[in-house]
Curated annotation (Swiss-Prot):
GO terms for biological process: phosphorelay signal transduction system. SUPFAM superfamilies: CheY-like. Keywords: Phosphoprotein, Plasmid, Two-component regulatory system. Signal peptide: none annotated. InterPro entries: CheY-like_superfamily, Sig_transdc_resp-reg_receiver. This is Uncharacterized protein y4jR. The modification 4-aspartylphosphate is found at D53. SMART domains: REC (SM00448). Residues 2-133 form the Response regulatory domain.
Length: 151
């Protein structure tokens, strides 16, 4: 199965890749670190499963040409919307280190975001889960989402 991981934090990215590769060693895994490169890879390779961070830069450092890297708090929402528009037959799970996004008065929780994306994009979006090295909830969520694609 083709899988795409879009994550900009090197330690979290390594953790996601290590876990996913150990659970699903026969899957074809692509990894990117920014919104635009992730969308390009999704368009070109049509992955069946996408593990996505919520807060991402628009461009990766090598694409940014020396400009300041600005994080977009709702990049994951944008990604899901665009993948849905591209009609890619995929399932997306968001794995985020943050539990709130944006700034007041537009602050939104991970749970609210999860409900919004499930409602708006039921054919693409699976769930949003909190990432923590100390807890295994994110591992269980990834494993369950991936295994559901085999049914």
């Amino acid at each position: 199965m083709k899988t795409l991981i879009v994550e900009d934090n090197p330690k979290k990215r390594a953790s996601l890749v290590e876990y996913y590769s150990s659970e699903f060693p026969s899957d074809d895994l692509e990894v990117t670190s920014a919104l635009i490169s992730g969308l390009r890879v999704a368009r070109d390779t049509k992955p069946e499963f996408i593990i996505l961070d919520m807060t991402l830069p628009n461009y990766s450092p090598d694409e940014n040409k020396g400009s300041r890297i600005e994080l977009m708090p709702f990049a994951g929402r944008e990604f899901v919307m665009r993948v849905n528009r591209m009609s890619i037959k995929t399932k997306v799970i968001i794995v985020s280190m943050f539990e709130t996004f944006g700034v007041a008065p537009r602050l939104i929780t991970l749970n609210s975001l999860d409900a919004e994306l499930r409602d708006r994009y039921p054919n693409v979006f699976v769930e949003a889960v909190h990432y923590s090295q100390a807890q295994a909830d994110w591992k269980t969520a990834i494993k369950n989402a991936r295994l559901s694609l085999d049914r």
